[in-house]
Swiss-Prot record:
Classification lineage: Eukaryota, Viridiplantae, Streptophyta, Embryophyta, Tracheophyta
Annotated tissue distribution: Expressed in lateral root primordia and in lateral roots excluding the meristem region. Also present in the aerial tissues, such as leaf petioles and the shoot apex region.
Organism: Arabidopsis thaliana
Entry function: Extracellular signaling peptide that may regulate primary root growth rate and systemic nitrogen (N)-demand signaling. Mediates up-regulation of genes involved in N uptake and assimilation pathways.
Biased composition (Basic and acidic residues): 63-75
Gene Ontology molecular function: hormone activity
Protein name: Precursor of CEP8
Gene (UniProt): CEP8
């Protein structure tokens, strides 16, 4: 009787150990740093004025002719000829 009780106790202890260790997930990851190094600038330069900047002088084409932007170019294919995703 004592052997059966001891055996049942060991089996139940083993089952509990397996259930508890199953909840612990082993992870392999890099360690995150808690302290960051502060980077200090040795010199501080302030730019005054816009001496090197260009202002104006550019042109933008705003009108699109019908030859460049035709209606037939953007129509969807018919359902029978659709290549599908990834083809």
């Amino acid at each position: 009787m004592a052997k059966a009780l001891f055996f049942n106790f060991c089996i139940s202890l083993l089952i509990i150990a397996i259930l508890v260790s199953h909840e612990i997930i082993p992870t392999e990851a890099r360690h995150l740093r808690t302290h960051r190094k502060s980077i200090k600038n040795s010199t501080l330069t302030v730019h005054e004025g816009a001496g090197g900047l260009r202002t104006g002088g550019g042109s933008v084409k705003t009108d699109i002719s019908k030859e460049e932007h035709g209606v037939d170019e953007f129509r969807p294919t018919t359902p029978g000829n659709s290549p599908g995703i990834g083809h």
